[in-house]
Amino acid sequence: MRIEASPLYLDTSALAKIYVQEADSDALDAALTGRRDILISELALTELTSALARRVRESQITAAAARRIYQQLLRDVRAGEYRLLDLTPATHREAERLLLTIGRQAPLRAADSLHLALAALADVRALITYDRHLHAAALALGSFEVLPISLDPAA
């Protein structure tokens, strides 16, 4: 995957692939190597932490591994690997607007509407998601390039 657009926003499904080896992790890592224009949100940090806890409950990773991944994520944020976007009242109002417009055409969940609103308000040029619902909603919005093009239908 080659990504020309800048800046770009990673939702939680994309951020997870950086920290937990999954399908497409290597391709995404290669595409993002050396970039300094990556935006993520506080929401993604919380959602990724929830996903790590789920993987521990399901015995996919150990609690120690989850803590290591979480600590690495925080180190990367502090080191400036990502620009961290906050959820603000304006973000919530935009998400609500998207739910009432795009949400009529595409399945748009509340958390996904927040990711979409964050990306739109930050004027990103590309959104990277591996979530099929967010992918469809982002395409319906039409404000930026939506990657990756191929998605796992089971996602």
Task: Locate the predicted segments by residue.
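Acidic, PIN/NYN-like endoribonuclease modules and their adjacent C-terminal/linker elements
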Residues: 1-7, 101, 120-155
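Acidic catalytic patch
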Residues: 78-103
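Alpha-helix capping/helix-boundary segments
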Residues: 14-15, 44, 91, 115, ...
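Alpha-helical elements of the RecA-like P-loop NTPase motor core of helicases
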Residues: 26, 93, 135-136
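Conserved SAM-binding loop
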Residues: 84, 108, 127-128
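PIN/NYN-family metal-dependent endoribonuclease catalytic core
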Residues: 9-10, 26-87
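Metal-dependent nucleic-acid phosphoesterase active-site entry motif
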Residues: 1-25
